[in-house]
Amino acid sequence: MCIRDRLTTILTYSIAIPLGITAGRHQDEWQDTSVQIFNYITLATPGFVFYILGLWLFGFTLGWFPISGSVSANASGFWGVFGSRIYHMILPAILYALITTTSTVQYLRTGIVDNKVEDYVRTARSKGVPENVVFHKHILRNSLLPIAAFLGNTITGLLSGSMIIESVFS
């Protein structure tokens, strides 16, 4: 697994876990609706279209990221080349992470919503345990277990989806 795939995995979970927690904790409120709209848009948009739009917006229009290559021509020395490689990896990694967050967000949201009504949560609330403790110790802990198991599926998806990313950003 290359560095970009590792960066993408870290970004995927860094984006997906807070979004899933927000959507699950605020079920049927505006936060949940916003996360669901984001999920549906990223799920319905084909990857190559999403990548080309991101490349056009952040590469051509705004000029924040390079549009091709893997190292700048004027990079010299180890740290210059290393920094240039990271700079060239950021846009593909972010765009791919945004696409791959959808399933993780949905799994986590569904787990939180399902665990909210379990007997052990109801028992903890009836004992007078503060809601924040109930959420972190009972609901969130049990909802994150499927996400940890889903990591293997995410890694295999990254390896297969790298071909599309490489063809768009080459």
Spans of model-derived segments:
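Membrane-water interface segments at transmembrane-helix boundaries in multipass membrane proteins
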Residues: 36-45, 49-101
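Alpha-helical transmembrane segments of integral membrane proteins
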Residues: 4-31, 47, 79-170
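Hydrophobic beta-strand positions within the nucleotide-binding domains of ABC ATPases
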Residues: 1-2, 41
